[in-house]
């Protein structure tokens, strides 16, 4: 099953995350199928490729709780349901 989830990168004590599509059995920092965006919790900066996310959701990808919250904040989940 494909999941939309966060992949950590950055330095110690300064995490940044990429929003990626990955197989649910892969390690957190394993190989991603596709990069869909970026999230920095320190500066609360988010960059999302809406078209790619909607494409993956229509193909049946599931989201993790954190990614779902990020997408709700960006009002992308509402677009997907309409």
From Swiss-Prot:
Gene Ontology molecular-function annotations: structural constituent of ribosome
GO terms (BP aspect): mitochondrial translation
Signal peptide: none
Pfam families found in the cross-reference section: Ribosomal_S16
A cellular component term, taken from the record's GO annotations: mitochondrion
Location of the protein in the cell: Plastid, Chloroplast
Protein's name in the database: Small ribosomal subunit protein bS16c
Organism (species): Porphyra purpurea
Organism phylogeny: Eukaryota, Rhodophyta, Bangiophyceae, Bangiales, Bangiaceae
């Amino acid at each position: 099953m494909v999941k939309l989830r966060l992949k950590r990168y950055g330095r110690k004590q300064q995490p940044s995350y990429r929003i990626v599509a990955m197989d649910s059995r892969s390690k957190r920092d394993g190989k991603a199928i596709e990069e869909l965006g970026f999230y920095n919790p320190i500066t609360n900066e988010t960059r999302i490729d809406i078209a790619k996310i909607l494409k993956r959701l229509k193909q049946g990808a599931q989201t993790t709780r954190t990614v779902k919250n990020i997408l709700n904040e960006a009002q992308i989940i509402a677009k997907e349901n309409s």
